[in-house]
């Protein structure tokens, strides 16, 4: 039986302009993302700051617009003050999220300087797991206030005369997940996020904030979590986050290649929930979505379970990607583009070594994985057009 179909493409009907921040990525203090990834003093390509130039060149060629930092699960136990000031005075800490040791040789100021060299914008997350309002407000002051206060003057003393001017901030990470340090109910998180958002915006009214949405569409609390959180935070945030990862553990290629359809439904459900809360609050404000963790992730699961704990920068989540994975990443990018009217920011998680498009060897070369290339090509796109596909209605048995 032969079937016919027609595809109509028109530039007159656009979904919307693609925000450049749709092509963001993510660096977490996890595995070799930082140490041995973007930062490796003593490497043949490292500059005076310890930043690997071979990695920086690949990142520039990838067209990444923004990078989320420092986590991720890591941020829910992070004391940001540990990562500023003289290196020799920074403490080594047990890092509970990934059972590693954090030397704190790379912190806020190093990240900001690295972002400038890479030509991208920072997206900072604050700790709402073990910390809260005061620490978040202090970090905004440290990063963004010009001078004349304790925190801004400390930034200057640490070598950054000009403010870092971080414009996008995440209010914690995956607080709905039982694995999260300081896990909270939607009610608990919503109240804390609301009050933290107020203090952060009083410190710098120009910033934009991202509330924690569900850590996956399969969570039992989805989408009630979004509804409850937004009832508390709607007027104080600009975005709510979405996270998803897909894998092919059973070798079911057709289902794996279709997983972006699940991503479509995830986006549409969260957007509908946002609109419901907007209507309920009779608000004139429209909320947008930040898909700030997405990727293929499954290859490294077995090896990660066998990893010895309490190492500095152990090789965790080092998936080796194939062509099938690149196809799925390409389909996921199409899902983001199809919803460019609501999804304004997104972060491929992660950027280097950890489920990443770029891999390195310690004291060795850097190279690109298969998923590097669909992202690189998509980052060149502009406005998105509707496509209309007409199929015959006859049922096929």
Regions found by a protein language model. Name each.
Residues 186-332:
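Noncatalytic carbohydrate-binding groove/subsite architecture in carbohydrate-active enzymes
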Residues 55-64, 111, 132-168, 193-203, ...:
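An active-site-proximal structural segment forming one wall of the substrate-binding cleft
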Residues 30, 290-382:
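Aromatic/acidic polysaccharide-binding cleft in carbohydrate-active enzymes
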Residues 387-393:
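Conserved small/polar residues in nucleotide/adenosyl-binding loops
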Residues 37-48, 90-104, 124-130, 172-190, ...:
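The substrate-binding groove and active-site-proximal loops of carbohydrate-active enzymes
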Residues 20-126:
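Active-site-adjacent substrate/metal-binding segments within catalytic domains
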Residues 25, 63, 115, 139, ...:
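Conserved, mostly hydrophobic/aromatic
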Residues 35, 40, 75-108, 149-179, ...:
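Aromatic- and acidic-residue-enriched carbohydrate-binding clefts of CAZyme catalytic domains
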């Amino acid at each position: 039986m032969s079937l016919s179909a027609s595809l109509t493409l028109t530039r007159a009907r656009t979904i919307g302009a693609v925000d450049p921040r749709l092509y963001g990525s993510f660096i977490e203090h996890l595995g070799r993302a930082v140490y041995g990834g973007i930062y490796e003093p003593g490497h043949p390509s490292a500059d005076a700051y310890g930043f690997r130039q071979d990695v920086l060149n690949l990142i520039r060629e990838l067209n990444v617009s923004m990078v989320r930092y420092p986590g991720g699960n890591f941020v829910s136990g992070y004391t940001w003050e540990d990562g500023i000031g003289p290196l020799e005075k920074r403490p080594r800490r047990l890092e509970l999220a990934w059972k590693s040791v954090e030397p704190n040789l790379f912190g806020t100021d190093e990240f900001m300087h690295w972002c400038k060299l890479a030509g991208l914008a920072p997206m900072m997350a604050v700790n709402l797991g073990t910390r809260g309002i005061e620490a978040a407000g202090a970090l905004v002051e440290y990063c963004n206030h010009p001078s004349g206060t304790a925190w801004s003057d400390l930034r200057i003393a640490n070598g950054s005369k000009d403010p870092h001017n971080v414009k996008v901030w995440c209010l914690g990470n995956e607080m709905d997940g039982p694995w999260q340090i300081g896990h909270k109910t939607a009610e608990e998180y919503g109240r804390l996020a609301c009050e933290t958002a107020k203090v952060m915006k009083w410190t710098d009214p120009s910033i934009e904030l991202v509330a924690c949405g569900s850590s996956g569409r399969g969570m039992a609390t989805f989408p009630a979590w979004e509804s409850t959180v937004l009832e508390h935070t709607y007027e104080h945030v600009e975005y709510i986050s979405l996270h998803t990862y897909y894998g092919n553990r059973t070798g079911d290629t057709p289902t794996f290649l279709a997983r972006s359809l699940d991503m479509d439904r995830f986006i549409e459900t969260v957007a509908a929930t946002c609109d419901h809360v907007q209507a309920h609050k009779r608000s004139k404000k429209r909320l947008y979505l930040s898909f700030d963790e997405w990727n293929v992730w499954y290859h490294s699961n077995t090896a990660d379970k066998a990893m010895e704990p309490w190492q500095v920068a152990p090789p965790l989540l080092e998936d080796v990607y194939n062509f099938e994975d690149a196809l799925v990443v390409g389909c996921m990018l199409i899902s983001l583009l199809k919803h460019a009217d609501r999804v304004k920011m997104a972060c491929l998680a992660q950027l280097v070594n950890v489920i990443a498009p770029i891999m390195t060897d310690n004291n060795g070369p850097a190279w690109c994985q298969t998923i590097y290339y669909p992202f690189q090509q998509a980052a060149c796109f502009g406005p998105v057009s509707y496509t209309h596909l007409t199929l015959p209605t006859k049922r096929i048995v």
